[in-house]
């Protein structure tokens, strides 16, 4: 099923929407809580509410392999969602809530692998507390003001991202790609940077706080 250019208002999507496509649609005061959206595609869609203090709810929804491209999702709640394999490309996710969502497939309690694709998105002030984003594609995002406390991004591609200087040290980034990222505020004495990739020009911002001169 394919919806194009349609407007939905005040609708609770409790039916099965797996693999359904929505293109350039507008969702006003709609509720996707616990919706079955696995494999669905949203392109150029806007999700808005009458209450300016909260966004659209995808709480506890099944968004496995769901695609959001160029969508307006500011303040949306993905709390508790099952999101393994989900992708967000060029989306406005400012202030979105991803707490308790799952983007990992657990084989055992200590063995798992992660899958989520977030690229070119505005993630300012979004809440990712405790998330597992290991070895995921997370390039060219704005992370300023986001809550990254306890997040594991080990092995992830964070290249060309924009981070707040005070966020360094709140999350794990061993073996990740930090090329073309402003590393101001990152203290190499307080973080495990094993295997981290950077560009030559980034060395100065890491070493100058130690009194070293890169020439």
Mark where each language-model region is:
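Tandem repeat scaffolds
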Residues: 1-215
């Amino acid at each position: 099923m394919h919806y194009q250019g349609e407007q939905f208002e005040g609708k609770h999507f409790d039916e099965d929407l797996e693999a359904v496509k929505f293109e350039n649609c507008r969702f006003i005061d709609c509720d996707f809580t616990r919706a079955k959206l696995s494999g669905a595609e949203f392109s150029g869609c806007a999700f808005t509410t009458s209450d300016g203090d909260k966004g659209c709810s995808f709480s506890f929804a099944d968004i496995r392999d769901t695609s959001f491209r160029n969508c307006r999702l500011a303040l949306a709640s993905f709390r508790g969602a099952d999101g393994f394999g989900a992708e967000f490309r060029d989306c406005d996710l400012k202030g979105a809530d991803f707490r308790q969502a799952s983007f990992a497939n657990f084989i055992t309690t200590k063995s798992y692998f992660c899958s989520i694709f977030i690229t070119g998105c505005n993630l300012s002030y979004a809440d990712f507390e405790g998330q597992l984003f290991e070895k995921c594609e997370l390039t060219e995002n704005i992370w300023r003001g986001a809550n990254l406390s306890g997040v594991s991004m080990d092995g992830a591609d964070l290249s060309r991202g924009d981070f707040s200087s005070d966020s360094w040290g709140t999350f794990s980034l061993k073996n990740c790609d930090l090329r073309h990222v402003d590393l101001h505020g990152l203290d190499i004495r307080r973080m495990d940077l094993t295997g981290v990739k950077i560009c030559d020009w980034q060395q100065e911002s890491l070493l100058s706080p130690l009194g070293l001169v890169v020439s």
